[in-house]
Regions:
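Non-catalytic C-terminal accessory region of glycerolipid acyltransferases
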Residues: 2-15, 104-257
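Membrane-anchoring hydrophobic helices of lipid-metabolizing enzymes
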Residues: 1-101, 169, 203, 246-257
């Protein structure tokens, strides 16, 4: 599944820097560091806003980690490779979401970044825009436990306001076989730029998010408690992220921040 990056490293770095600077300006992005991450390679765990690889939350996390000495590998849904854009994802540090990809990154001294909510969180409706939704997924916690890596939660508020999602379209995705063809379980019905009212387009394809203010908080590192299993650890991470999200949006005005 891994593919050759479409861009040479220097070109990819230049494009990445330009995009992240654009995100900082367009979204008036603020970064709050609740605690400095450990110096050694870690597992950063983020939440989705809306969309897949073009989700502003993914870009916000990348922008938040720009000054870190280590590079990051982003674990990405294999749909990117199914659709033939794996080379583009790889050029910007993406790799198929697997234990093998994570271990390879850590072996080379890179951090790993994962968004456990996956497609369901990335396609959530407007009413759920401020919810962290891992849907019982605990693979990331097991990964960190098996390889003795700290989990560093990263929470971003605001990206769910970049489009108006009427419904996640989970039943529709199942009806048309999207879950079987691409392992993608939602087909959002949304209003977005440039797609207007669409079914699935702004979830699967790039869209121009509205200029909502983004705020990212980097939380203190977390490790499993004595006797805690992966499910319990994952739930504790999700709860910590939701608590921080609640703080970030307590007095928030949509789009304005």
């Amino acid at each position: 599944m891994p593919s050759t990056p479409w861009l040479p490293p220097q070109a990819a770095a230049a494009v990445r820097a330009a995009v992240l600077e654009a995100v900082r300006r367009y979204h008036r992005h603020d970064v709050l560091i609740d605690a400095e991450p450990p110096r050694e390679p870690v597992l950063f765990v983020g939440n989705h806003g809306f969309g897949t690889v073009t989700d502003p939350n993914v870009l916000a996390v990348a922008a938040s980690l720009r000054q870190r000495a280590r590079q990051q590998t982003y674990l990405v849904h294999d749909m990117a490779w199914t659709l033939g854009v794996g080379g583009l994802v790889a050029a910007f540090g993406g790799a198929p979401a697997s234990e093998e990809s994570a271990v390879e990154a850590w072996t080379h001294g890179r951090d790993v970044v994962v968004f456990p909510g996956g497609d369901r969180e990335a396609g959530k409706s407007w009413r759920d825009r401020n919810r962290v939704m891992f849907n019982g997924r605990s693979g990331f916690a097991r990964l960190a436990m098996d390889h003795d890596k700290a989990v560093v939660p990263v929470v971003t508020a605001g990206a769910g306001e970049g489009a108006f999602v009427l419904t996640d379209g989970e039943r529709l995705a199942s009806a048309v076989g999207l879950d079987r063809a691409l392992r993608y379980k939602v087909l959002p019905v949304s209003l977005s730029v440039p797609w207007g009212l669409s079914v699935g387009l702004s979830g699967l394809l790039p869209y121009l998010p509205l200029p909502s203010k983004l705020v990212t908080a980097i939380l203190p590192p977390m490790r499993p408690a004595a006797g805690e299993d992966a499910a319990g650890f994952a739930q504790r991470v999700e709860d910590a992220m939701q608590s921080r999200m609640d703080d970030l949006v307590a007095n928030r005005i949509p789009l304005l921040g």
